[in-house]
Amino acid sequence: MLAMSIGLPTHPAKCYAASGPSWIAENILNNTGFVGRISRDLVLRELPLRDAVKFWGAAASRRSAAELLDVLSVTGGVPRYLEEVRPSLPALENIRRMCFLPEGTLFKDFKRIFADVFGPRAALKARILRAIADGPLNGAEIAKAIGIGRGGTISDELDELELAGFVAKDAGLNPETATRTRTSQYRLSDNYTRFYLQYVEPRATEIEGRKYKFAALESLPRWSTVLGYQFENLVLANFDRLQELLGLKGTEILSAAPWRKKAADGKSGCQIDLLVQTARTVWVVEVKRRARIGEEAVDEVRTKLARIRFKGRKSIRTALVYCGELAPVVRGSGFFDFLVPAEELFR
């Protein structure tokens, strides 16, 4: 029946596999001509860090977490991209080869996958991704940024981008009301896409003419900010491992998502990188990637806590997931209940 309904030749001994999430949803799952039960609805996610690091083979044990994360900040945990990594080369050379040469896999792949997956609607979806490349936005903010009306169109486009793995919809519990957040935030969750839109696409002509010389990640505009977003994506994508490190394995999680409180009525807002809520406890998780992480990390989280009016009498715990040199004052302050170095996410 499936083969007949979508125009494929039928054969009793053959099984057909279709790819492209939006095509499958539109032409099979939501097609009235499809009759039958779905055996399995499987969405392939990127590899967890403990598996992604295996692409470095024996060299992984000799590489710093920072160097591994430099590459993963560009590739994410996508196996096809990790196959292009040469473990013997430094991170910067791997990135140069993959992104900043005309024959590089990551230089060519964005337009190809977008055209294959989304067809004629690829241009609109790319505009949406550009709008959230600088940080998460809600649906109304995205519609305004790209100049289209709010409503079904933007919702449908975001749903397809989420299904395809480009976007994550963050909609946890509001800690001030203990109810589901009414306005979801849409985050660009695919590290390759953000890196491409921020740094490769604007230089495409120079790269094609072999005139662009990539020297260092630090020389890229706003790299420290983008690096923070990329590291946050990797931490959020590896929440299962983080649960273990925070002693939450086996605990029922009511909500786990970034949370943003807007400024209103003259009061300042705040952004929590990851807010984990259980029946009795709220975990405020800060994610930092800097060369040196000092007392400002403590001050920032303390300020955020002061701006949130937690509902009920729950315990509050704090955690810092970090990559960089941790100043002794941070550990000595005792402010963070858990300090999680990036190395632990790979284990």
What are these regions (language model features)?
Residues 1-216:
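Phosphate-binding site recognition
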